[in-house]
Amino acid sequence: MAVGNINELPENILLELFIHIPARQLLLRCRPVCSLWRDLIDLVTLWKRKCLQEGFITEDWDQPVADWKIFYFLRSLQRNLLHNPCAEEGFEFWSLDVNGGDEWKVEDLSKDQRKEFPNDQVKKYFVTSYYTCLKSQVVDLKAEGYWEELMDTTRPDIEVKDWFAARPDCGSKYQLCVQLLSSAHAPLGTFQPDPVMIQQKSDAKWSEVSHTFSNYPPGVRYIWFQHGGVDTHYWAGWYGPRVTNSSITIGPPLP
């Protein structure tokens, strides 16, 4: 039987069509069309199936989800928000706030270091010198796709990670500071652990530091990430801590 109006189609057929439409078009173009489309597009079933279709969840997913629509968008946006975290582009995207001693430098991970590092995609690192070296990056959340209502109402978890290591022949100090900032760049949350002091003749293994911001105040618009350090023997050259594979991610943990 011919259908003269798309709304004469059974609701399950309409739902099947909506599943294959990009999410932003669903909300901006389809949802305002009529109350029937609005109600169908708001169904939990639709967004759960879109999550499954995109590989955001598995068939046996059993974790509670408060809002599948928000979950879908958070998962679709989820990526490392720090640019050039592993020095593949030199110092592109980084601000060299303090550039002491012989200044920041980029070095290659040696073959042995690559075997030890948990991510085989990492090939380079940043290294500090005999006077303090600090570099930073500011993440503009709106520019990265995280709209204001999402950040203020949902306030998704913000996870920060960094990797650092000393040289075996020289002591060093590593430091990290991450701040959640308002539109006026006022701090709304800070993670600043005590500096890590590494003694000379350490095992020089890579260590990870991580922190998750949860239940922070509304108004977060930027994230400021700064790390670096100094060697504690003041040797000319690049004997301070090495850093690489830094990351800032927003949203639920990956399955």
Curated annotation (Swiss-Prot):
Keyword tags: Ubl conjugation pathway
Domain F-box span(s) in chain numbering: 3-50
Chain ranges of the FBA domain: 71-252
CDD domains, per the entry: F-box_FBXO6-like
Subunit field text: Part of a SCF (SKP1-cullin-F-box) protein ligase complex. Interacts with SKP1 and CUL1.
Function in brief: Substrate-recognition component of the SCF (SKP1-CUL1-F-box protein)-type E3 ubiquitin ligase complex.
A family per Pfam: F-box-like
Name of the protein: F-box only protein 44
GO BP: proteasomal protein catabolic process
GO cellular component, one term: cytoplasm
Xref: InterPro entries: F-box-assoc_dom, F-box-like_dom_sf, F-box_dom, F-box_only, Galactose-bd-like_sf
UniProt keyword Ribosomal protein present: no
SMART domains: FBA
Tissue: Expressed in brain, liver, pancreas and adipose tissue (at protein level). Widely expressed.
Species in which this protein is naturally found: Mus musculus
